[in-house]
């Protein structure tokens, strides 16, 4: 920490953003804001930084006054839970269009009469003519002209991200790499190529992870750019994000596949550190936010997994062993005439639950207000049309 710079630790959730600031003199300050309040500020993290630095909302933040900003975010988590990622096309070999849908043929309810197929993150599939055998020999050359035409067509239809997954691509990736180049030339801002994202020999797990990366990375990139644009001077190198595995990474290296449990992973690290200070080595963590709830276990060491399923989506990447469900304080309450259903959609921070006074829907938080379980005196004055 420099003698004249500020450091910030930020937990940016789907509903609330919590901030800890270390002033140049070493003292600490905290703040809590709604993650989205467009009538008052553009972004909660930036608003908090400006408040601590004494800047108005239209003033750029001097990058020279910032030491480090370390952030955990549920931007990717909530985009996955609510299926609000970038429109994605899957590019794979001819004849393998249904490979990821068929997957391992697992059925969550073996004896159910109605078989409900899992929802896929990709909107379209392009079957590329071209194939490489397991020994690396080219069986069929890549039809570049046809692939280029197909990619340009789906790009014109509004798809923004491409996931390239070819058989044996984990080892022999020249054809995959060439397909990625064609996709970028066709105008796709985000191109996730399986041998770079998840170089694993099993095509299904490699493909699933690549699709997740393509689906979520544009959401993260847009958020990082929005943060960086608020600074006067280059600040990306000062911005770090928590990854799903509990470690920090430079904002410029933050990928969708590593961001799914960014916010929750920070909660696990924080809970473990807090429990050790209090003399506890064995804890169960319960982290209920506005959009999702996360449960973890800690017994003296962090528990990590390589393969996991989140909201019905399979991912193969190192991450904390956290169980996430789409149920939080902002989860919307639905009644279909026979039963009450909670979520998975959330009221978020804007408009938020009905009790926020912004015309939002009935949510879990409203039920807790009606039953008297929430005590207003413990909440900051950040609600309502005037955020007071």
Residue map of PLM features:
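N-terminally biased helix-coil "hinge/interface" segments that flank
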Residues: 1-388
